[in-house]
Amino acid sequence: MQKEPMSQFGYDKLAAELKDLKDNQRPAVVIEIDTARSHGDLKENAEYHAAREKQALIESRIAELSDLLARAQVIDPSSYEHDSVKFGSSVVIIDLDTEKESKYTLVGICEGDLDKGYISIASPIAKAMLGKKEGDDFKVRLPKGESEFEILSINYEPLKF
């Protein structure tokens, strides 16, 4: 079973979504199905079929979240040194072709937010950076082709969700 690294915030966010699905959305869709069923012929009952489809989506998401939470590895990135790129590291890199600098923080798969510079630890660029140190170069295959980067700095900054 592969562990999924995430912050406490990410874990709590997923747990809250799972609780809402189980405690609110699942019972509500059962009522919708019962109401639609009471309207008669199920073959041509669009309301019934829509409610059943919604129920399937809810059950699928419950299963997905339950699995993810069972595999969760809550990590406190403030508890270790960031002398190399790890989960929770904030990394400044430079594209060696364009000389464009970018800053990314490596977070769990459910915590990515590119507007804040938070990228999933499972993303290609994060995978390529893991374990690297300041001054190291790395290559990554992106949709636009292969790019080469240099790590300018690595540090820890508290996550701000």
UniProtKB/Swiss-Prot annotation:
Q: Which GO terms describe its molecular function?
A: DNA binding; RNA polymerase binding
Q: What are the record keywords, sorted?
A: Coiled coil, DNA-binding, Transcription, Transcription regulation
Residues in coiled coil:
45-73
Q: Which GO terms describe its biological process?
A: DNA-templated transcription elongation; regulation of DNA-templated transcription elongation
Q: Which residues cross the membrane?
A: none
Concerning Pfam families, the annotation shows: GreA_GreB (PF01272), GreA_GreB_N (PF03449)
Show the InterPro entries listed in the entry. Answer: GreA/GreB_C_sf, TF_GreA/GreB_CS, Tscrpt_elong_fac_GreA, Tscrpt_elong_fac_GreA/B, Tscrpt_elong_fac_GreA/B_C, Tscrpt_elong_fac_GreA/B_fam, Tscrpt_elong_fac_GreA/B_N, Tscrpt_elong_fac_GreA/B_N_sf
The UniProt entry, under PANTHER family, shows: TRANSCRIPTION ELONGATION FACTOR GREA (PTHR30437:SF4)
Give the HAMAP family listed for this entry.
Answer: GreA_GreB
Q: Which NCBIfam families match?
A: greA, PRK00226.1-2, PRK00226.1-4, PRK00226.1-5
Q: What is this protein called?
A: Transcription elongation factor GreA
Classification from the root reads: Bacteria, Pseudomonadati, Campylobacterota, Epsilonproteobacteria, Campylobacterales
